């Protein structure tokens, strides 16, 4: 029995990155030998065991053979005669097909170390094409390591295009698509994930609402980058700089979906694109089974992001109605989330990346003023039932009006 550290732990150690999870491969052992050594079996489809002390995963060396469609259509063979090289060959990328023995020696039969140094994401073998989920995994790795200047090998991108054209991605379940997307959205450069998917044709298949934005022009006066798809990825990049929150990043990604519905004869203007985009957000989220809290924020951002941009000319009544619309009284975090997504929208434009966004500050300040109006005083004044809410709203509007006159006066007044 020989035990090797494999995959991501070896890769990240060689890159000088923190190692989070460790996976191990056991060569020359049977399931019974693992059980006798105190390991706990957890894998149903193939033998995976938990170490009795560390609870890290130890998998018996195995091979995989395509036996059906999609990413689940594989037959696994695990036995003592499966070599380490054979186990590593089934992995997706050469940089993940690395192992380290107990003496610290690196086993690298597929030149993963060379590709690490060259900053290349390259598939191990033609078997890559048998698993459509790997298209998304490569896109995610490209996003994860974009700050290290990794790129996808030409032959790997070509294979990803072939897989997409052959309809392989249609076998992916919504849950798996969303899981990879969720992980990609939490990387330092989530926009790279969607750019890679577009480069291989997968964006049109998996995210048609986003793909439809490319080639849709916006007024050059407001959008020097012109292309709405390009702007969308720029705003996502900016959102990633402004916030680590998944919901903020996802909402930013979806903020301009409504522009994909604008008739060509109305280009480059997109009046009403915010409310129009709400149904597309709903459609995308329903198809991919996006969590409800992410969906709800994305719908609000789509509908109201342009309103935030016009904050200086908003009436106090409109500002308080906005807080009502986003349910800020029960979910106050939404004020900050919408401020961040609106800022990402403005700064996610060519030449505006370093711009100040005072509207975000004003929105936050107005919220502090509005929520500081005490409900207790309204009740003590004798108001009852629906009168309480009506009076509370009046007082909130008055408080915001007083604040706005001092801090954010209407430029037209």
Curated annotation (Swiss-Prot):
<feature type="binding site">
    <location>
        <position position="8"/>
    </location>
    <ligand>
        <name>CTP</name>
    </ligand>
</feature>
<dbReference type="Pfam" id="PF01743">
    <property type="entry name" value="PolyA_pol"/>
</dbReference>
<keyword id="KW-0547">Nucleotide-binding</keyword>
<keyword id="KW-0694">RNA-binding</keyword>
<keyword id="KW-0548">Nucleotidyltransferase</keyword>
<comment type="similarity">
    <text>Belongs to the tRNA nucleotidyltransferase/poly(A) polymerase family. Bacterial CCA-adding enzyme type 1 subfamily.</text>
</comment>
<keyword id="KW-0511">Multifunctional enzyme</keyword>
<keyword id="KW-0533">Nickel</keyword>
<dbReference type="Pfam" id="PF12627">
    <property type="entry name" value="PolyA_pol_RNAbd"/>
</dbReference>
<keyword id="KW-0808">Transferase</keyword>
<feature type="binding site">
    <location>
        <position position="8"/>
    </location>
    <ligand>
        <name>ATP</name>
    </ligand>
</feature>
<feature type="binding site">
    <location>
        <position position="137"/>
    </location>
    <ligand>
        <name>CTP</name>
    </ligand>
</feature>
<dbReference type="InterPro" id="IPR032828">
    <property type="entry name" value="PolyA_RNA-bd"/>
</dbReference>
<dbReference type="GO" id="GO:0016791">
    <property type="term" value="F:phosphatase activity"/>
</dbReference>
<dbReference type="InterPro" id="IPR006674">
    <property type="entry name" value="HD_domain"/>
</dbReference>
<feature type="binding site">
    <location>
        <position position="11"/>
    </location>
    <ligand>
        <name>ATP</name>
    </ligand>
</feature>
<dbReference type="GO" id="GO:0042245">
    <property type="term" value="P:RNA repair"/>
</dbReference>
<feature type="binding site">
    <location>
        <position position="23"/>
    </location>
    <ligand>
        <name>Mg(2+)</name>
    </ligand>
</feature>
<dbReference type="GO" id="GO:0004810">
    <property type="term" value="F:CCA tRNA nucleotidyltransferase activity"/>
</dbReference>
<protein>
    <recommendedName>
        <fullName>Multifunctional CCA protein</fullName>
        <ecNumber>2.7.7.72</ecNumber>
        <ecNumber>3.1.3.-</ecNumber>
        <ecNumber>3.1.4.-</ecNumber>
    </recommendedName>
</protein>
<dbReference type="GO" id="GO:0004112">
    <property type="term" value="F:cyclic-nucleotide phosphodiesterase activity"/>
</dbReference>
<feature type="binding site">
    <location>
        <position position="21"/>
    </location>
    <ligand>
        <name>Mg(2+)</name>
    </ligand>
</feature>
<keyword id="KW-0460">Magnesium</keyword>
<dbReference type="GO" id="GO:0001680">
    <property type="term" value="P:tRNA 3'-terminal CCA addition"/>
</dbReference>
<dbReference type="InterPro" id="IPR003607">
    <property type="entry name" value="HD/PDEase_dom"/>
</dbReference>
<keyword id="KW-0067">ATP-binding</keyword>
<comment type="function">
    <text>Catalyzes the addition and repair of the essential 3'-terminal CCA sequence in tRNAs without using a nucleic acid template. Adds these three nucleotides in the order of C, C, and A to the tRNA nucleotide-73, using CTP and ATP as substrates and producing inorganic pyrophosphate. tRNA 3'-terminal CCA addition is required both for tRNA processing and repair. Also involved in tRNA surveillance by mediating tandem CCA addition to generate a CCACCA at the 3' terminus of unstable tRNAs. While stable tRNAs receive only 3'-terminal CCA, unstable tRNAs are marked with CCACCA and rapidly degraded.</text>
</comment>
<dbReference type="InterPro" id="IPR002646">
    <property type="entry name" value="PolA_pol_head_dom"/>
</dbReference>
<dbReference type="GO" id="GO:0005524">
    <property type="term" value="F:ATP binding"/>
</dbReference>
<keyword id="KW-0819">tRNA processing</keyword>
<dbReference type="GO" id="GO:0106354">
    <property type="term" value="P:tRNA surveillance"/>
</dbReference>
<dbReference type="Pfam" id="PF01966">
    <property type="entry name" value="HD"/>
</dbReference>
<dbReference type="GO" id="GO:0000287">
    <property type="term" value="F:magnesium ion binding"/>
</dbReference>
<feature type="binding site">
    <location>
        <position position="140"/>
    </location>
    <ligand>
        <name>ATP</name>
    </ligand>
</feature>
<dbReference type="InterPro" id="IPR012006">
    <property type="entry name" value="CCA_bact"/>
</dbReference>
<keyword id="KW-0378">Hydrolase</keyword>
<feature type="binding site">
    <location>
        <position position="140"/>
    </location>
    <ligand>
        <name>CTP</name>
    </ligand>
</feature>
<keyword id="KW-0479">Metal-binding</keyword>
<feature type="binding site">
    <location>
        <position position="137"/>
    </location>
    <ligand>
        <name>ATP</name>
    </ligand>
</feature>
<keyword id="KW-0692">RNA repair</keyword>
<dbReference type="GO" id="GO:0160016">
    <property type="term" value="F:CCACCA tRNA nucleotidyltransferase activity"/>
</dbReference>
<dbReference type="InterPro" id="IPR043519">
    <property type="entry name" value="NT_sf"/>
</dbReference>
């Amino acid at each position: 029995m020989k035990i090797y550290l494999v995959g991501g732990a070896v890769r990240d150690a060689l890159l000088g990155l923190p190692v989070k999870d460790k996976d191990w491969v056991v060569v020359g052992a049977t399931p019974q030998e693992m059980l006798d050594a105190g390991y706990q079996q957890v894998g149903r489809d193939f033998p995976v065991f938990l170490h009795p002390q560390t609870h890290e995963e130890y998998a018996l060396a195995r091979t995989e053979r395509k036996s059906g469609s999609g990413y689940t259509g594989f037959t696994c063979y695990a036995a003592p005669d499966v070599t380490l090289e054979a186990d590593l060959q089934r992995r997706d990328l050469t940089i993940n097909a690395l192992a380290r023995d107990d003496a610290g020696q690196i086993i690298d039969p597929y030149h993963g170390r060379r590709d690490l140094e060259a900053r290349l994401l390259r598939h191990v073998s033609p078997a890559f094409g048998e698993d459509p989920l790997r298209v998304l995994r490569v896109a995610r790795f490209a996003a994860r390591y974009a700050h290290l200047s990794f790129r996808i090998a030409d032959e790997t991108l070509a294979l990803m295009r072939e897989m997409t054209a052959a309809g392989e991605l249609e076998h992916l379940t919504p849950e798996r698509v969303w899981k990879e997307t969720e992980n990609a959205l939490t990387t330092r450069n989530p926009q790279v994930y969607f750019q890679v998917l577009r480069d291989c044709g997968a964006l049109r298949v998996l995210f048609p609402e986003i793909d439809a934005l490319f080639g849709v022009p916006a007024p050059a006066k407001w959008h020097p980058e012109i292309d709405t798809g390009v702007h969308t990825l720029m705003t996502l990049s900016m959102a990633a700089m402004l916030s680590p929150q998944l919901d903020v990043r996802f909402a930013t990604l979806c903020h301009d979906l409504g522009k994909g519905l604008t008739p060509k004869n109305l280009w480059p203007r997109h009046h009403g694109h915010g409310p129009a985009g709400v149904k597309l957000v709903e459609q995308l989220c329903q198809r991919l089974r996006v969590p409800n809290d992410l969906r709800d924020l994305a719908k609000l951002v789509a509908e109201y992001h342009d309103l935030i941009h016009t904050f200086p000319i908003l009436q106090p009544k409109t500002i308080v109605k906005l807080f009502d619309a986003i349910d800020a009284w029960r979910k106050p975090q939404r004020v900050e989330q919408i401020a961040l997504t609106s800022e990402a929208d403005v700064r996610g434009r060519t030449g505006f990346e370093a711009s100040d966004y005072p509207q975000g500050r004003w929105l936050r300040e107005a919220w502090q003023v509005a929520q500081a109006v005490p409900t207790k005083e309204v009740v003590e004044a004798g108001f009852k039932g629906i009168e309480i809410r009506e009076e509370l709203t009046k007082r909130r509007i008055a408080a915001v009006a007083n604040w706005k006159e001092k801090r954010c006066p209407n430029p037209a007044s």
